[in-house]
Swiss-Prot record:
Keywords: ATP-binding, Ligase, Nucleotide-binding, Protein biosynthesis. The gene is gatB. This is Aspartyl/glutamyl-tRNA(Asn/Gln) amidotransferase subunit B. GO terms for biological process: glutaminyl-tRNAGln biosynthesis via transamidation; translation. It is an enzyme of class 6 (ligase). Its EC number is 6.3.5.-. Gene3D superfamilies: 1.10.10.410, GatB domain, N-terminal subdomain (1.10.150.380). HAMAP family: GatB. PANTHER family: GLUTAMYL-TRNA GLN AMIDOTRANSFERASE SUBUNIT B MITOCHONDRIAL AND PROKARYOTIC PET112-RELATED (PTHR11659), GLUTAMYL-TRNA(GLN) AMIDOTRANSFERASE SUBUNIT B, MITOCHONDRIAL (PTHR11659:SF0). SUPFAM superfamilies: GatB/YqeY motif, Glutamine synthetase/guanido kinase. Heterotrimer of A, B and C subunits. NCBIfam families: gatB, PRK05477.1-1, PRK05477.1-2, PRK05477.1-4. Belongs to the GatB/GatE family. GatB subfamily. GO terms for molecular function: asparaginyl-tRNA synthase (glutamine-hydrolyzing) activity; ATP binding; glutaminyl-tRNA synthase (glutamine-hydrolyzing) activity.
Length: 476
């Protein structure tokens, strides 16, 4: 029997507001434990929540960017459960009247575009953070308690773990572009739970789903889903029954492990939050927020193709993160040719960032510096090989490309008399290479060029070297 995989994702995104959703407590990441909290966050008796308007507008902005319908009447509800990181024994969330519904985004997998529906986007408060010491006790930090977040629930439209990865990449990109969150998984500002079930191909009814947690990266989401997909298939093929449960992905064992039997919404005993009135969002407010939405990745991608003449692949890679797209655009604005700027950002820059595990904001390279170096290549002042030395200096120490070239004596040698001597020396030292070339071995030219570049410390002008070399060989 063959099965179809059905996947839905629940993504929690912390909003980048200056204060918490129901109190004036600040929300910086990395503060000393339990220093960014208040009696409201901790649910002391007699205190009342006050809704943060900026959090509402950030949620609206995110929902609009995800093509959601924005509610006119919305409200908050209490989600009741006991856990050490939940001091009130309930969480203020939204149940039956979310702020956004019926959205969608488009993903691209294997060269094909697919629309993934978004069931809802609702606003809620985050919980505290537990740290398990391994010594028989746990520590709880309530700094995160009350931080505003949105939960974005996809439709069960995802059919493969690869599609799930693409969906998360696209969702993160859109949210980052809006500016409502930095979406840093390593800081907990983006978290994902995945629901997965299998059903016989052709069957409309969904199978029993399991929820996956402990997914610390998009790669873990994909791997966890791949392993859970195999586990469920093995259970079903052996005549077993899938239980509705919560499991976690363990990277060490490459397996999903049972955590607990999955709760349903009835277990949370939702009821309307009595300390907050219903929220009315009129058309004027909606349009005011909509006007703040910047150019989103798909729009920018289209512009790069149509106006800058970039290949579709380049445009897709560059617009994946707002940071990279902004850097590229500023580099072009400083005079660099668009395709050359794209090549450097997708090549040397990305390779360096990946190797050093850094972001663009962490390095000294500036758009001015990169543009200056590209212009020196275009003018023939430096070769592509020399440019790599200049690039290393720019990305590690910053500065002006032209100044670096002059100070380090890296100007490309284009003087014909100097190049002629280099060519003559190489030919005199390698007579066999001349014979090899004349006998049809084209690789001999590559060897000779390499010798000349070595002698010039990479500074000889390659096109001129090739031209002079061929002319001199003909004379011998």
């Amino acid at each position: 029997m063959n099965f179809e995989t059905v996947i839905g994702l629940e993504v929690h995104v912390e909003l980048k507001t200056k204060s918490k959703i129901f109190s004036s407590s600040p929300t910086p990441f990395g503060a000393e434990a339990n220093t960014q909290t208040s009696v409201i966050d901790l649910g002391y008796p007699g205190v009342l929540p006050v809704l943060n308007k900026e959090a509402v507008e950030f949620a609206m902005k995110a929902a609009m960017a995800l093509n959601c319908e924005i509610a006119t009447d919305t409200k908050f509800d209490r989600k009741n459960y006991f856990y050490p990181d939940n001091p009130k024994a309930y969480q203020i969330s939204q149940f039956d009247k979310p702020i956004g519904e019926n959205g969608w985004i488009e993903i691209e997998v294997g060269g094909k575009t697919k629309k993934i529906g978004i069931t809802r986007l609702h606003l809620e408060e985050d919980a505290g953070k537990l740290t398990h010491t391994g010594d028989g006790y746990s520590l709880v930090d309530f700094n995160r308690q009350g931080t505003p977040l949105v939960e974005i629930v996809s439709e069960p439209d995802i059919r493969t773990p690869e599609e799930a990865y693409a969906y998360l990449e696209k969702l993160k990109s859109i949210i980052q572009y809006t500016g409502v969150s930095d979406c840093k998984m390593e800081e907990g500002s983006l978290r994902c739970d995945a629901n997965i079930s299998l059903r016989p191909i052709g069957q409309e009814k969904f199978g029993t789903k399991t929820e996956l947690k402990n997914l610390n990266s998009f790669a873990f989401v994909q791997k966890g889903l791949e392993h859970e997909e195999k586990r469920q298939e093995q259970v079903l093929l052996s005549g077993g029954v899938i239980q509705q449960e919560t499991r976690r992905y363990d990277e060490a064992t490459k397996k999903t492990i049972l955590m607990r039997v999955k709760e349903g919404s009835d277990d949370y005993r939702y009821f309307p939050e009595p300390d907050l009135v219903e929220l009315y969002i009129d058309d004027e407010w909606k349009e005011r927020v909509r006007a703040t939405i910047p150019e989103l990745p798909d729009e920018r991608r289209k512009r790069y193709i149509e106006e800058l003449g970039l290949p579709a692949y380049d445009a897709m890679v560059l617009t994946l993160t707002k940071e990279m797209a902004d850097f590229f655009e500023e580099t072009v604005n400083k005079g660099a040719e668009a395709k050359q700027a794209s090549n450097w950002l997708m090549g040397e820059v990305s390779a360096y960032l990946n190797a050093e595990q850094k972001e663009l904001e962490d390095v000294a390279l500036t758009p001015e510096g990169l543009a200056g170096m590209i212009k020196l290549i275009e003018k023939g002042t430096i070769s592509s090989k020399i440019a790599k030395k200049v690039f290393k200096e720019l990305i590690e120490k910053g500065g002006d490309a032209e100044k670096i070239v002059k100070e380090k004596g890296l100007v490309q040698i284009s003087d014909e008399s100097v190049l002629l001597k280099l060519v003559t020396d190489a030919l005199d030292s390698n007579p066999q290479s001349i014979e090899d070339f004349k006998n049809g071995k084209d690789r001999a030219i590559g060897f000779l060029v390499g010798q000349i570049m070595k002698a010039s410390k990479g500074q000889a002008n390659p096109p001129m070297v090739n031209k002079i070399l061929l002319e001199e060989i003909k004379k011998r």
